[in-house]
From Swiss-Prot:
It holds the Pfam family DUF726. One of its GO terms (cellular component) is membrane. The chain crosses the membrane at residues 200-220, 228-248, 343-363. It is a multi-pass membrane protein. This is Transmembrane and coiled-coil domain-containing protein 4. InterPro entries: AB_hydrolase_fold, DUF726. Residues 1-27, 555-595 are annotated as: Disordered. The lineage of its organism: Eukaryota, Metazoa, Chordata, Craniata, Vertebrata. It comes from Mus musculus (Mouse). It is found in: Membrane. Residues 156-183 form a coiled coil.
């Protein structure tokens, strides 16, 4: 029997390909019958904890039924395992985990169960996000570091890469003749060609089908490899990596879709992974923050990461407006705090200076335009993910400010479709300018398999200002917790890290650490393999630095000087107080009034109410108007 040796964390080693006559079987079947039962019971009980919703019952039933067959357990145990998956029985998952760890095979190699469960989840060429959440959960219960699961996933891909290198000269010549005959010009760009009923998998280019199956045999066993070697099996394998294995880099909006003018994916890293991450920027600033990928250079959630480039023209105008108004506030003469109630976090009283309100259109106009466009971009992203452009792999979405709003409307749109499950693994919304009432987040439980993270800052006065006409009666997610009662929902108070709205871009490295997203230490020198041209050029910031206070992170490290968002002369002792400007001098008002005018005019809602930076749900579906009349 073949055994699995854990490779060194820094240098994953792919196992040797199995011989053709080797009757290799999955590792799970090498366990004793009692431990195979404990293995299935552990998964069943975990499913009941992770996905208790009625909408998930069909997935749990199908998964458990297939796992029992995969482990060659008697059909008589299926009702018992199904009872565990339904939440019945008093046994806990920890009991089954401890039983498994006593097995001789798992005592020295506890990751064997994770490897086998990963193999089972991938046997059909589909990697459901719910399956990965389960694999991660079981891996944690068995006290296996998550880095080892990443290695297992990488080894699976390495077997495919090795198969490509072993492609014979005859097979290569035949493939090239077919490519030339069919004139698949896009093959050079997206790495996939389908010719004469045969399929070439494009993980890193073209892979011969028999060799792909040979490489996968070492991971899923000879029986699974035989299935993958068939025409149907290779087709499903191709679907795992999306459009020819090129992920989302092969997608670019061919024509304008509705109000959207720009929408494309930029690679943040060079690499392939069984799960991908999409980062979404909220605005474009000056200096090193003028590019979409600048805030995400330390992100290390996956080896395959993308940045969504959308509506650069309007995001640049918004960024200029933000920096203009904040630069003018450097001359303010006094400040006062926004007071929040202890229980609800809703603004109790606020008095905005007349000088600031008089130049509010500097930010209101571009903000209102971007509010509408972010909603449309989110809906378009939803349809791309639903069409599996990224392949049948789990997707994690991370965004700040208007980028978080894109994610919000993406989830909202996906929740309306029946096939929305099993696509999204985790979502992270930071400083989200969206509705924070739990009833609006409830449908996301059916879309997101893993975590729904809401990162908020109680002291974000700029976000409060753009919501000034409605924030008294509206719960803004970027200012307070979202009180959704679900195991997925996680609220993270970033007040100690984020001094103002612009810090979401400038302190992203620290923010990602606080919310539990992996970052690469020393990423500038030895980080992830960055895509060519993804690292922005350093340029001096054009905006004034008005505070030299240092932010002390949770790990005790100093995070440099605070940004111009931290405009304060006094610091409130309570975390429930936020800084806001109380007055501007005449020169400041004049400089703000003469700022560049936004591209689109002042937006008036059809309901007849005055201009408002808050997007009205009744208006975002067909117009670019805003309204204070919110449900």
């Amino acid at each position: 029997m073949a055994t699995w040796n854990r490779p060194h964390p820094r240098q994953p080693v792919a196992p040797e390909p199995a011989a053709e006559d080797d009757s290799q079987q999955p590792l799970g079947r090498e366990l004793s019958e009692a431990n195979r039962f404990a293995y299935a019971a552990l998964c069943g009980f975990s499913l009941s904890q992770l996905f208790p919703e009625p909408e998930q019952s069909s997935f749990c039933t199908e998964f458990v039924t297939g796992l029992v067959k995969w482990l060659h357990l008697s059909e008589s145990v299926l009702p018992t395992i199904m009872a565990f998956a339904s939440g019945l029985g008093g046994e806990g998952a920890d009991i089954f985990a401890q039983t498994l760890l006593q097995d001789p095979i798992l005592r020295d190699n506890p990751s064997a169960v994770s490897q086998d469960l990963l193999s089972f989840s991938l046997k059909n060429g589909h990697y459901d996000a719910r399956a990965r959440v389960l694999v991660c959960h079981v891996t944690s219960l068995l006290q296996v570091p998550m880095e080892e699961l990443d290695i297992l996933e990488e080894v699976f891909l390495e077997s495919l890469k090795d198969a490509k290198e072993e492609e014979s000269e005859t097979a290569e010549a035949s493939r090239k003749r077919k490519e030339k005959r069919r004139k698949w010009k896009r093959y050079l760009l997206i790495g996939l060609a389908t010719v004469g009923g045969g399929t070439v998998i494009g993980v890193t280019g073209g892979l011969a089908a028999p060799l792909v199956a040979a490489g996968a045999a070492t991971i899923i066993g000879s029986a699974g490899a035989a299935a993958l070697g068939s025409v149907a099996g290779i087709a499903v394998m191709t679907s795992l990596f999306g459009a020819a294995g090129a992920g989302l880099t092969g997608y670019k909006m061919k024509k304008r879709v509705g109000a959207i003018e720009e929408f494309m994916f930029l690679p943040l890293t060079e690499g392939r992974q069984l799960h991908i991450t999409i980062a979404i920027t909220g605005w474009l600033g000056s200096g090193r923050y003028r590019t979409f990928n600048a805030p995400w250079m330390a992100l290390a959630r996956s080896q395959e990461q993308y940045c969504l480039a959308w509506e650069a023209k309007y995001l640049m105008e918004l960024g200029n407006a933000l920096e203009t108004i904040l630069s003018g506030l450097a001359n303010m003469v006094a400040q006062e705090a926004l007071k929040y109630t202890v229980l609800s976090g809703i603004v109790a009283a606020l008095t905005w200076p007349a000088s600031l309100l008089s130049v509010a259109n500097v930010i209101d106009n571009p903000w209102g335009v971007c509010l509408h466009r972010s909603a449309e971009v989110g809906k378009h992203l939803a349809h791309i993910l639903l069409s599996r452009q990224q392949g049948r792999r789990p997707v994690t979405l991370i965004g700040f400010s208007l980028g978080a709003r894109v994610i919000y409307f993406c989830l909202q749109e996906m929740a309306q479709e029946q096939d929305c499950q099993g696509i999204i693994e985790d979502v992270v919304l930071l400083g989200a300018p969206v509705e924070g009432d739990p009833k609006h987040w409830e449908p996301f439980r059916n879309v997101v398999s893993g975590r729904i993270i809401n990162g908020y800052c109680r002291g974000d006065w700029l976000l409060s200002f753009v919501y000034r006409t409605s924030s008294v009666q509206l719960r803004v997610a970027g200012l307070q917790p979202v009180l959704l009662q679900d195991r997925r929902m996680e609220n993270v108070d970033l007040t100690s890290v984020v001094n103002g709205h612009l810090d979401y871009a400038k302190q992203m490295d620290a923010i990602l650490k606080v919310v539990g997203i992996r970052t690469k230490p020393g990423w500038r020198e030895k980080g992830l393999p960055l895509a060519p041209g993804s690292l922005p050029q350093e340029e001096p910031l054009q905006t004034a630095i008005v505070s030299t206070d240092e932010i002390i992170l949770q790990d005790g490290q100093s995070q440099g000087p605070a940004s111009e968002d931290s405009l304060k002369t006094t610091i409130p002792s309570s975390a429930s107080q936020a800084q806001m400007p109380a007055g501007l001098n005449q020169s400041t008002e004049d400089s703000l009034s003469t700022a560049a005018a936004p591209a689109e005019g002042h937006l008036i809602c059809s309901h007849g109410v005055g201009p408002n930076p808050l997007g009205c749900p009744d208006c975002t579906h067909g117009t670019q108007e805003s309204c204070t009349e919110l449900d």
